[in-house]
Amino acid sequence: SLVFSPEIDELSKPNKIVSLYDPCCGTGGMLTVGKNWIKENISKDVEVNMFGQELNPQTYSICKSDFLITNEQPENIKLGSTLSKDGYQDTNRKFDYMICNPPYGVSWKKDEKYVKNESKEPDGRFSVGIPRTSDGQLLFLQHMISKMEPSGSRIGCLLYTSDAADDWSS
């Protein structure tokens, strides 16, 4: 709700169409929850087009199947590593809203060559810096920033930090 609440007036406009993107969508659960929250709490008339990308072939298949069953647009879900092969790069697609829960502590070593090369490009997704290869959460955040509409977008990203596991969080 933090992503959408400040936009209630904008989302309540007649014939409103918005895009919702998750770069590590898994089975599509966060996308579905986001769309349902907008429909139930803001306006059932908003058209929410969902987009996502998933690395794991099994969870990708579940997401595509769910989209088929629920009459969504399964072609909007891409297979592959968001970090090394942006599924929306060819169209330079931007999104109104982006949500994700990137994998914590997952190595991006397989994508290292591509990520490092792109980090050297002034307009590259990762040009502000790259984290250690043992945890790529911040790469997903940088990726989403690159997908923002020129007029602005809203991002909700659940990042895990080691502080969350320390005594401070008790």
Task: Label each PLM-derived region with a short phrase.
Residues 160-170:
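Single conserved hydrophobic/aromatic residue that forms the stacking wall/gate
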Residues 23, 53, 78-80, 100-107, ...:
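Generic beta-strand/beta-sheet core signal
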Residues 64-89:
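S-adenosyl-L-methionine
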